[in-house]
Amino acid sequence: MEHSNHKLIILSRDGVINEHRDGFVTTPDEWVAIDGSLNALAKLNQANFRVVVATNQPGIMLGKLTISNLNAIHQKMHAEVEAAGGQIEAIFFCPHSADACCTCRKPSPTMLKDIAERFDVRLDEVVYVGDTINDMHAAKAVGCHPYLVLTGQGGATYAAGELPDE
């Protein structure tokens, strides 16, 4: 598929595409799409956006989520998005917990830089949609255009009033 006229949008997963859970989404049954999110993804594709997901999954390092289950969760997400007429081109994830001090976990921008390299895009031309302050800081650090949704943790993030300046 030719993508020269397609823009890239990066979405966080939990709280943006699927319902946020206290704890972790550890099985496909626990992954529940937010009402309207699957149709929104399809509309993004119809508007010539290529959709990529960037997600922190600390449950892996903490032993609460296996790679096998993560793959099954993502297979379910892909299937539901495709059934709604959309497509996710790639999913990038960090398996580390916050105390691991890794470089791939948001708010570090490394995951976003990896996406830019793989898709050969300039991050200042990319929209990033997330629901946490870490999402906003990661996007801002590399010049993405950050958008905060009010689903998931977005309402609390907005209410805290600590968003990076535009």
Residue ranges and their predicted role:
Residues 27-34, 66-71, 105:
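Flexible, glycine- and charge-enriched loops at secondary-structure boundaries
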Residues 1-52:
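Active-site neighborhood of HAD-like aspartate-dependent phosphohydrolases
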Residues 37, 41-74, 87-100, 139:
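Substrate-recognition element of Asp-dependent hydrolases with the DxDx(T/V) motif
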Residues 14, 20, 94-96, 152:
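Generic beta-structure capping elements
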Residues 14, 56-57, 131:
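Short, well-ordered beta-to-alpha junction loops that form the rim of enzyme active sites
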Residues 26-29, 59, 101, 128:
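Generic anion/oxyanion-binding catalytic loop in active/binding sites
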Residues 2-5, 9, 68, 72-89, ...:
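Asp-based, Mg2+/Mn2+-dependent phosphohydrolase catalytic module
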Residues 21-25, 63-64, 158-161:
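Short acidic, glycine/proline-rich loop/turn micro-motifs
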